[in-house]
Design a protein with these regions (language model features):
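Plant-biased, solvent-exposed loop and capping regions
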Residues: 1-498
Length: 498
């Protein structure tokens, strides 16, 4: 007698077979996930009276959830994520009182949360991210869902204040309400969630950043705090005492990006000794990059682009411990909810899978790059573009042998491109465009495999992939390099022979 049918992770096409339960009323598990099935969820599914698990995620299913699905009184897992399903969620979904996991993310569902959902009192995981759900979230009563550990309602159209009833879900470990239209302030009642480790409220309309920090720093279990796209045009609180020595004691990821915050990098960040990932991109932060960042023993990703930061690249930044010797200190625990790259939409389930990164692009930084940069041997991504850096590109950059992305474009670098950069064998994204570089692009290396756009805007550069030919004249120990452009214009530079 058939009790389980698992067809997951294949390449099946067509409709999900509607005969699944006609002759198999004792079936307990149906798994059609990760295939290419299309069409609607078959009617007749409600005849599977013993069914506990129904999975059909990552297919091409469309249409509404079939109405008879609420007859599955024993259902514990309903997983239909990553399809093209639409319509409203079943109004009587509360009849699925044994439901543990409801995963309907990445579809096109509309309408409000069904009030009957509060009857799913065994619900453990609720993920409805990336739909078109709407309504005043503050009016939904979460208090009966006391077994919830994960709630993800991100990327929908909910509005209103943060629902106070959420704070009755004492088992809650992860909460994502990002990319909605929520407003108001973070309430102190959130401190009732003693197990809360993951909090993402990005891209809403929250206010009072100072209040938010004062409250959240006391949430002892927090490891991930994502609050970017809120607190628009407020001042980053710089008071050294705002975060005590025990504040944010377990925090690993902190994001306040895309908020147009003013002020400087606050010194209280130096107390976050478990911080691994800090992003403050797209603000109006001024002042210099503080040397105390190097005292954060686990920091491996620093995003400060699109600000008003001035000064030089601090030598102290080259002493970040996790970028020098080992990423052993970086947390390798599975994240309670995945992190998504907003550009690539790449999904990260582990912090250790994220690139070791320093991004300082689009600021007012100046001066030369310190030779100490060669100490950051584990760096994967370095972006210093659109600043006012000058001087030569240091040879020591060739010691960054893990580099996959190096962007030095739109600065005032001069001299030649160091031939030693050819040792950066993992480099797949490179640009020195719009500087004052001259001389030949190192030949016989992968540096010549990049597009012309990686070198444009340097009148003195020559050699492939540029069309400008290289030539040189030797006068004793002095070499004159020149680039003969297609236009016939002569661009001359010089260097000493070795």
């Amino acid at each position: 007698m058939l009790t389980e049918l698992n067809l997951s992770n294949n390449t099946f096409v067509g409709l999900i077979p509607s005969f699944s339960c006609i002759n198999a009323s004792l079936v307990r598990l149906l798994d059609f996930s990760h295939n290419h099935y299309s069409g609607h969820i078959p009617r007749g599914l409600g005849a599977c009276s013993k069914l506990k698990v129904f999975r059909a995620g990552f297919n091409h299913l469309s249409g509404p959830i079939s109405s008879d699905i609420v007859n599955l009184a024993k259902l514990t897992n309903l997983e239909l994520y990553g399809n093209k399903l639409s319509g409203k969620l079943p109004m009587n979904i509360g009849k699925l009182s044994k439901l543990n996991d409801l995963l309907l993310d990445d579809n096109s569902f509309t309408g409000p949360l069904p009030p009957s959902l509060v009857n799913c009192t065994n619900l453990n995981i609720l993920i409805l991210r990336y739909n078109f759900l709407e309504g005043d979230i503050s009016t939904f009563n979460f208090s009966s869902l006391h077994q919830l550990t994960v709630i993800d309602l991100g990327v929908n159209n909910f509005f209103g204040n943060l629902p106070v009833s959420l704070y009755s879900c004492k088992s809650l470990v992860a909460l994502r309400l990002s990319a909605n239209q929520l407003e108001g302030q973070i309430q102190p009642e959130i401190l009732q969630l003693k197990l809360l480790s993951f909090l993402s409220l990005t891209n809403n309309r929250l206010t009072n950043i100072t209040n938010a920090i004062k409250i959240l720093m006391r949430c002892k279990a927090l490891t991930i705090v994502l609050l970017g796209g809120n607190f628009l045009h407020e001042a980053m609180p710089g008071d050294d005492t705002i975060v005590g020595f025990n504040g944010f004691e377990n925090l690993q990821v902190l994001s306040f990006d895309e908020s147009q915050l003013t002020g400087q990098l606050p010194i209280w960040l130096s107390r976050l000794k478990k911080l691994e990932f800090l992003t403050l991109d797209f603000n109006r932060i001024t002042g210099s990059i503080p040397g105390w960042l190097s005292t954060l023993p686990r920091l491996f990703a620093l995003y400060l682009s699109h600000n008003l930061i001035s000064g030089e690249f601090p030598k102290e930044l080259c002493a970040l411990p996790t970028l020098q010797s080992s990423k052993a200190l970086v947390g390798n625990n599975h994240l309670d909810l995945p992190l998504f790259n907003s550009i690539s939409n790449f999904r990260y389930n582990f912090l250790s899978n994220m690139r070791a990164t320093i991004v300082l692009a689009n600021n007012n930084l100046s001066g030369s790059i310190p030779v100490e940069i060669g100490r950051l041997k584990l760096l994967d991504h370095l972006d210093l573009s659109h600043n006012k850096f000058s001087g030569s590109i240091p040879n020591e950059m060739s010691q960054l042998t893990n580099l996959e992305i190096l962007d030095l474009s739109a600065n005032q670098f001069s001299g030649e491109i160091p031939a030693s950069l050819s040792s950066l064998h993992f480099l797949n994204n490179f640009s020195v465009a719009n500087n004052n570089l001259h001389g030949p692009i190192p030949s016989g290396t992968q540096l010549q495999s990049f597009d012309v756009s990686a070198y444009e805007g340097n009148l003195g550069l020559c050699g492939p992939p540029l069309l400008d030919e290289c030539a040189h004249i030797v006068f004793g120990e002095f070499v004159v390099h020149y680039s003969l452009a297609i236009s016939g214009e002569l661009h001359i530079s010089n260097s000493w022979t070795k």
